[in-house]
Amino acid sequence: MTERIVLAYSGGLDTSVAIGWIGEATGAEVIAVAVDVGQGGESLETIRQRALGCGAVEAYVADASDEFANEYCMPTLKANALYQGHYPLVSAISRPVIVKHLVKAAREFGATTVAHGCTGKGNDQVRFEVGIQTLGPDLKCIAPVRDLALTRDKAIAFAEEKGLPIETTKKNPYSIDQNVWGRAVETGYLEDIWNAPTKDIYDYTATPEFPPAPDEVIISFEAGVPVAIDGVRVTPLQAIKELNRRAGAQGVGRIDVVEDRLVGIKSREIYEAPGAMALITAHKHLEDITVEREQARFKATVGQRWSELVYDGQWFSPLKRSLDAFIEDTQKYVSGDIRMTLHGGQAVVNGRRSETSLYDFDLATYDTGDTFDQSMARGFIELWGMSAKVASGRDIRVAGK
């Protein structure tokens, strides 16, 4: 029986060429797998037909946009996950759901190997292969760009020689990855970290220097999940899309950062994540009034570690699963409404309300009639500062000898 290889297929030049390239290099039949995570663009049927036209014996296509929003974006939101304080894990969280469907397709079509189009310098090779090893430990992995020396020049030449139904061009100097949670742009002139991004690289966001009138929005949450916008019930996917549209029109969510890659190098990245950044901002402000202080402090540490694990391709790891359980427990009372104004590249919260709020007006007010007993403060301060006071006394005593 002829060996079968499942290929993570985007519909672009590199993975279209990889179908024939893998076939010639290995003699195997190739099954193309395309997964919709809300990236927009061409229809799944168009992509399926292109894969078949490029030589795939089967084409598996899956609309995973709701699955991605519910099972991957929402945990990211609950964690307030920003890798190194900036990056909302746009590409990192899409890889596990793609891996899930790659392994599913491999089982369905009797494949023994999974292929992806990642280079040997990026994070995605790790995310794909660690995920595949975890969900399908018997499956082998190959990476044509990395393992079979498939360069872009070779890809163009191969496509033209074979007459493949795919556009061949060297025009676009950027590497772009996008889904409903955001958009990532790298390489080209951006590799000189002194170069400012030009307007042409942006697609999800309008120029914030010339915004339309301010847009006020009310986002309602239940247990950490957005459930309504301006009183209209929405699914997580609908919430992200609506805020992509509204926050994007105001230039919200542009990120220019140099980050530490898993493989040990620093990389300059441009991200657009208008919906994600608006939602994370709103969610964090709701947590500020609903999550107890010590729990909130520790959750910030957990969220940072969660972000690192996901960035590093450990979505399916035991530690990440344990952190998920802690984060989920913190969301029990994260329900209520956040009002924010979107304008000029900013998402500014100016109102919050919750039936499970820990904010007590009578305790917090400085007006007459407050219920805070200030007479307790002196004793509290004495006890709170006791340890430092005793240590200071020792320092003075030792220094005087």
UniProtKB/Swiss-Prot annotation:
It is found in: Cytoplasm. Pathway: Amino-acid biosynthesis; L-arginine biosynthesis; L-arginine from L-ornithine and carbamoyl phosphate: step 2/3. One of its GO terms (biological process) is argininosuccinate metabolic process. Pfam families: Arginosuc_syn_C (PF20979), Arginosuc_synth (PF00764). Keywords: Amino-acid biosynthesis, Arginine biosynthesis, ATP-binding, Cytoplasm, Ligase, Nucleotide-binding. Its EC number is 6.3.4.5. InterPro entries: Arginosuc_syn_C, Arginosuc_syn_N, Arginosuc_synth, Arginosuc_synth_CS, Arginosuc_synth_type_1_subfam, AS_cat/multimer_dom_body, Rossmann-like_a/b/a_fold. It is an enzyme of class 6 (ligase). The keyword Nucleotide-binding applies. One of its GO terms (cellular component) is cytoplasm. L-citrulline binds at Y87, N123, R127, S175, E259, Y271. The keyword ATP-binding applies. It catalyses: L-citrulline + L-aspartate + ATP = 2-(N(omega)-L-arginino)succinate + AMP + diphosphate + H(+). L-aspartate binds at T119, N123, D124. ATP binds at A8, Y9, S10, G11, G12, L13, D14, T15, S16, G117. GO terms for molecular function: argininosuccinate synthase activity; ATP binding. PROSITE patterns: ARGININOSUCCIN_SYN_1, ARGININOSUCCIN_SYN_2. Belongs to the argininosuccinate synthase family. Type 1 subfamily. Homotetramer. This is Argininosuccinate synthase.
